[in-house]
């Protein structure tokens, strides 16, 4: 059943419900939230509806009795061969032969547009994803957010949304100061100063590379003695490794130490401090942009945290005017518990500095001020406690919190054999997204990042992702596409060609159970795409493509598409030619849908493998 036919069937049931309401069998305000689903067993029809079960309570009747009334009220339709009531009250719909093949017509007519919808046409939605601190290269954990966010954005566009992809650049705050100071200390080293590098500094080689560039550009212009920078700074943390291999703090305070170095660096450098901050920021941000672009991830907007500095105080004033702020222990608190949060939150510290949460309130207000109907935040799972406070702030500002959806993406564990690779951006020892892509390829990375529900951890098997076997789902799905391309190449070599008109005229020859299953699964693609998009669940699409590829491979291995006579130099019979064109039509339809689905996930559809 094509999407148009699904819409028609939905309309038929709506008409029947209208009759029941008019006859007083159902309340006039009853809302139809039933589903039309593809049946797994063809003996149960092509599609089934649970509408009678959902209406039974409102109708105050047995579901089977309600089903009988609905069936009797259904308008006639030429595509429907038979309707049966099954089990507790399911309504099974059997299509006639011609209607079953309508999906093939849709696929060939719409091609790349098959499955797309305009249901949400005109609605603006923003998807913010990755938004990693610009303090180091992206690691493999960030890659999952990138693949997920881009796939979700593509899916939302496919159902009609006007999508804005956004990266929130955290270019303000303490982490940037740690980066700037780390860069400055490495700059001193390149100029011959002996530096005791802080435990809490960013220690990767990329910081030294940035510092070397600054030395080339500015020589020793900004050099100060390290002794002056470390003057009166609290002792850094000192650790030892105990008998169990655990790191144990002996003395010192790494946070107080780095804060002291930051303060002294700012005082000694004056305006020059911004040079180091901006140089590090621009270098790392450029690297992030290049990395994501190479990964097939792009954005309409790179939004700077600094750009909303001027919006923080006005938004806090709004909350104060509404009576949602109060002072306690010198801090200014937001009454987030009034809106369901577990505790109130500080928005301005006693020293007068606003908190990161205050900045986030201003940022989210800014999002809705820009006219988005809906906003989707793709966050790491460690941000789960942050969701209630952000929604509380929206409610306090008079913004419908349901317009914000937050998807929490779990972490990625990367395995090399039996060894689990650990990551730490400050130590400089982490596996980057770029390294992963170079090892397994973009397609494998993009697929396995989204192949599971976002709330489920991913154990990324490098060896599996590189293998050429049916166990590697990326290879398995892409190979189905390549197989069809190979068949068409063989056909061309034999001097024959695909005749779509003959294929369409002979498609009723496709009566084998495996062929009927393939056609039914192709018909399910539009609904699958819609469900995957509206639920922000690209794994639904990956599972569909896996099922489609498996059905195709099984059918391909059991049935000849090209007649044996072609390889022996004989002329195929008329019956063989008719079946060949029908099966070529089905094969091309499978290829088209696989290509469409892979494209939405950001994967290639190779013609040979």
Curated annotation (Swiss-Prot):
It catalyses: tRNA(Arg) + L-arginine + ATP = L-arginyl-tRNA(Arg) + AMP + diphosphate. Keywords: Aminoacyl-tRNA synthetase, ATP-binding, Cytoplasm, Ligase, Nucleotide-binding, Protein biosynthesis. GO terms for molecular function: arginine-tRNA ligase activity; ATP binding. Its EC number is 6.1.1.19. Disulfide bonds: none annotated. A motif ('HIGH' region) lies at residues 132-142. One of its GO terms (biological process) is arginyl-tRNA aminoacylation. The keyword Ligase applies. GO terms for cellular component: cytoplasm. It is found in: Cytoplasm. Pfam families: Arg_tRNA_synt_N (PF03485), DALR_1 (PF05746), tRNA-synt_1d (PF00750). Signal peptide: none annotated. It is an enzyme of class 6 (ligase). Monomer. PANTHER family: ARGININE--TRNA LIGASE, CYTOPLASMIC (PTHR11956:SF5), ARGINYL-TRNA SYNTHETASE (PTHR11956). This is Arginine--tRNA ligase. It comes from Psychrobacter cryohalolentis (strain ATCC BAA-1226 / DSM 17306 / VKM B-2378 / K5). The gene is argS.
């Amino acid at each position: 059943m094509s999407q148009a036919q699904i819409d028609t069937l939905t309309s038929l049931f709506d008409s029947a419900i209208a009759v029941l309401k008019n006859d007083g069998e159902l309340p006039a305000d009853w809302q139809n939230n039933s589903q039309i689903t593809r049946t797994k067993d063809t003996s149960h029809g092509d599609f089934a509806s649970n509408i009678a079960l959902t209406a039974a309570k409102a109708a105050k009747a047995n579901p089977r009795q309600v089903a009988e009334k609905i069936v009797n009220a259904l308008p006639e339709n030429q595509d429907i061969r038979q309707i049966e009531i099954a089990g507790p009250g399911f309504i099974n719909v059997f299509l006639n032969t011609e209607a079953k093949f309508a999906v093939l017509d849709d696929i060939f007519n719409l091609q790349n547009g098959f499955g797309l919808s305009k249901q949400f046409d005109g609605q603006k939605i923003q998807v913010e994803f990755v938004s990693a601190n610009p303090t180091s290269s992206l690691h493999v954990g960030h890659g999952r957010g990138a693949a997920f966010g881009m796939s979700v954005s593509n899916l939302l566009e496919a159902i009609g949304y006007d999508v804005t992809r956004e990266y929130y650049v955290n270019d303000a705050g303490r982490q940037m100061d740690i980066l700037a100071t780390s860069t400055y200390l490495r700059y001193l080293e390149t100029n011959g100063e002996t530096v005791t590098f802080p435990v809490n500094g960013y220690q990767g080689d990329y910081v030294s590379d940035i510092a070397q560039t600054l030395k080339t550009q500015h020589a020793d212009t900004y050099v100060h003695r390290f002794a002056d920078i470390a003057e009166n700074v609290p002792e850094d943390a000192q650790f030892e490794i105990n008998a169990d291999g655990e790191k144990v703090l002996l003395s010192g305070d790494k946070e107080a130490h780095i804060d002291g170095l930051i303060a002294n660096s700012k005082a000694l450098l004056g305006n020059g401090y911004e040079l180091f901050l901006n140089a590090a920021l621009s270098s790392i941000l450029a690297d992030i942009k290049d990395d994501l672009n190479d990964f097939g991830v792009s954005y309409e907007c790179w939004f700077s945290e600094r750009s909303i500095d001027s919006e923080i105080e006005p938004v806090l004033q709004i909350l104060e005017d509404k009576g949602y702020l109060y002072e306690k222990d010198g801090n200014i608190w937001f009454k987030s518990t009034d809106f369901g949060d577990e505790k109130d939150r500080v928005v301005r510290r006693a020293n007068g500095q606003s908190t990161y949460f205050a900045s986030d309130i201003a940022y989210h207000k800014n999002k809705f001020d820009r006219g988005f109907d809906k906003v989707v935040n793709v966050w790491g799972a460690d941000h789960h406690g942050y969701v209630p406070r952000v929604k509380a702030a929206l409610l306090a500002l008079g913004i419908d919190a349901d317009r914000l959806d937050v998807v929490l993406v779990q972490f990625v564990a990367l395995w090399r054999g039996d060894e689990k690779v650990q990551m730490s951006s400050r130590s400089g020892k982490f596996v980057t997204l770029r390294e992963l892509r170079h090892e397994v390829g973009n397609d494998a990375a993009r697929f396995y990042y989204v192949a599971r529900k976002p709330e489920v951890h991913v154990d990324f098997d490098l060896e599996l992702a590189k293998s050429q076997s049916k166990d590697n789902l990326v290879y398995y799905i892409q190979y189905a596409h390549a197989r069809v391309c190979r068949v068409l190449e063989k056909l061309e070599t034999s001097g024959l060609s695909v005749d779509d008109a003959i294929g369409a005229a002979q498609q009723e020859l496709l009566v084998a159970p495996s062929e009927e299953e393939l056609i039914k699964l192709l018909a399910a693609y539009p609904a699958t795409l819609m469900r995957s998009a509206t639920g922000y669940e690209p794994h639904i699409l990956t599972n569909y493509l896996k099922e489609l590829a498996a059905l195709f491979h099984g059918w391909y291995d059991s049935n000849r598409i090209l007649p044996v006579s072609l390889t022996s130099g004989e002329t195929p019979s008329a019956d063989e030619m008719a079946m060949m064109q029908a099966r070529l039509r089905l094969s091309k339809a499978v290829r088209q849908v696989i290509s469409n689905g892979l494209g939405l996930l950001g994967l290639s559809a190779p013609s040979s493998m």
